[in-house]
Amino acid sequence: MSDGKKTKTTVNIYGQHFTIIGEESKAHMRHVAGVVDDKMREINEKNPYLDINKLAVLTAVNVVHDYMKLQEKYEILERQLKEKE
């Protein structure tokens, strides 16, 4: 959870080091980076001939797709809860 204080950490995503600054904990930022790294490797396994730029874009598209599906499910659950009130 964010407390307003900036945190800086270095992460490794797909063999590249990135410095990330945010309001979340270092553990959270490392976890996020790990999820991105895992997704990139998953996509690369299915199509090893993608260059790094295409791999990064496809990773972003996949992650946003997953996020949007979860958001839709959340909104449905919220509506169901309101209907029960």
Curated annotation (Swiss-Prot):
What keywords is this UniProt entry annotated with? Cell cycle, Cell division, Coiled coil, Cytoplasm, Septation
Q: Where's it found, cell-wise?
A: Cytoplasm
Q: Name one GO biological process term.
A: division septum assembly
Q: Name one GO cellular component term.
A: cell septum
**What Pfam families does the entry give?**
ZapA
* InterPro entries per the UniProt record, alphabetical: Bac_CellDiv_Activator, Cell_div_ZapA-like, Cell_div_ZapA-like_sf, Cell_div_ZapA_firmicutes
Q: Which residues form a coiled coil?
A: 59-85
Which branch of life, at top level? Answer: Bacteria
Chain's role: Activator of cell division through the inhibition of FtsZ GTPase activity, therefore promoting FtsZ assembly into bundles of protofilaments necessary for the formation of the division Z ring. It is recruited early at mid-cell but it is not essential for cell division.
Question: What does the similarity note say?
Answer: Belongs to the ZapA family. Type 2 subfamily.
Provide the assembly information: Homodimer. Interacts with FtsZ.
Q: What is this protein called?
A: Cell division protein ZapA
**What lineage is this protein's organism placed in?**
Bacteria, Bacillati, Bacillota, Bacilli, Bacillales
Q: Which gene encodes it?
A: zapA
